[in-house]
């Protein structure tokens, strides 16, 4: 049985993990009888957004606690991940990836990724273990791995940010994936595009299948 780590960033696309992207990822992994462990940072979100009005709320919310809503409580803090214990890593998107797992949403090409997440991503990369990234999450890979290699990923139709981060960006529709065989990366744009839910699901399904295929070639 394969073991896959999934990192999420809260609950809700405006300030946390994109719920559809996360659920589609978990569903497709379950279809392949994969042992999944879900992780999230144990710290407060950058901010909290009312998903009905899309306005900021005057409250604080812990990322791990919020993420537990999607994980049905079966979740661990980010510092529990050890790359050696898993066959692959997958990162769904949402604004949480741009604000809680990085500061891309604030600094664009000048963004950084927290040291703990950097070490996790580099750990999987150094062990040649495949990494899947969805929506805005491929930009995290570009930030973290730019001092190690030049990667190929996608954010969908517009990849200017990826190019500014020193990576190669490929145009891709929601139902397809971009594969970087050399660096063992698989990406799909999902909600970076205004596409039907069925197409987004198809793209994530393809990503999961390709990541699992890569696991057998480690």
What are these regions (language model features)?
Residues 1-2:
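A short, charged/proline- and glycine-enriched loop
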Residues 39-64:
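N-terminal beta-loop-helix "entrance" segment that forms/cooperates
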Residues 57, 65-68, 121, 173:
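Short, well-ordered helical secondary-structure segments
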Residues 5-31, 35-37, 74-76, 80-218:
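Active-site-adjacent pocket-lining segments in enzyme domains
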Residues 60-74, 82-84:
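Glycine/small-residue-rich loop that forms an oxyanion/phosphate-binding "nest" at active or ligand-binding sites
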